[in-house]
Amino acid sequence: MKKGRTKISATAEADYLADVALAANFDQLLSRAQLADQEFREAQATGAPLAVQYARARDLDAALTDATRAAYAAQRAEIGPAGYDDRIYRRKAKATSAVHRWTDEAERLLTLRETHRLSGFPARPQADALGLEIAHVPATEHA
């Protein structure tokens, strides 16, 4: 072992391999999120019952969550196993363009998920069954 080199811990290696495995599924998870978004928008456009819209909204939320987790895993995998234990190594690696691409994609997906959670969910079917009225904030135009 060369002087100055740190040995990668077993936990860091295991975390790295788990992230590599999750990152390998990113394209599939992103496609699933796009399909879930398309199905949810279609249910909204056709005026499907609220129970159907709510189920599609939940599916979209789960798909966006999975895709976001995979993007962050790809970011950590791009940094490498040394980044799990060494914060300076991780910080330097985060400055590379390859890691920036994954960070941007993960933050884009996270923003989509948060926007969907804040404004995309229809009323819960249980509220409709109980005869509860859901307050809606009127849309305002931004100047």
Describe these PLM feature segments.
Residues 29-43, 60-63, 67:
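Non-transmembrane amphipathic alpha-helical segments
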Residues 58-78, 101-108:
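Amphipathic alpha-helical coiled-coil segments
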Residues 1-8:
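Short Lys/Arg-rich cationic patches that frequently serve as NLS/NoLS or arginine-rich RNA/DNA-binding motifs
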Residues 50-59:
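Short, charged, amphipathic alpha-helical segments
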Residues 8-30, 42, 46:
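Short, charge/polar-rich alpha-helical segments
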Residues 82-143:
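Amphipathic alpha-helical binding modules
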Residues 46, 53, 70-73, 77-80, ...:
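Soluble, cytosolic/nucleoplasmic coiled-coil alpha-helices used as oligomeric scaffolds and tethers
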